[in-house]
Amino acid sequence: LLESYKQAVRPLLPYLPWLEQSAGKRASSIYSGQDIGVNSVSFPVYDGTLLNFVREATKSPLMDRNYAYVYTRHRIRTHQEERDIIQKAGWKEWDILRGILSKYVLGGRTKGNLWSEAVSERIFYLVLKQMQEIIEFWDKTPANGKL
């Protein structure tokens, strides 16, 4: 089980430094060239690193399409509640971490501001960091659990 968790998280870890640096900042902007606001609906332009992260996360087994159930069952409503649960999460709460990550990755496909929100509110960073810490704590291999 631990090995499958490591394999799922490993492709996302290279994005940790970028997610940490981007915390509190917007990872998207609204395209407004060629007077687009006058004739049509404006649309967001995302940071390339964010798009690559979302693409990797979408392919990973960490995605839980039933993420809404995690939010309902644990009564998660605000970003602060998300951060509190993430910080307290351990091995047994792995599914909660998956649910929170999934809400933003999968939900961002239809609700344009979710990806940016997850970066600025540090949700992506905190979930990945906590997953990494859980794996490193429980992994007793000679490499000392380093991913």
Where do the protein language model's features map onto the residues?
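Short terminal alpha-helical segments
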Residues: 1-68, 126
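Charged, low-complexity interaction regions
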Residues: 17-32, 36-40, 62, 87-91, ...
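Alpha-helix capping and inter-helical loop/turn segments
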Residues: 58-62, 91-92, 135-136
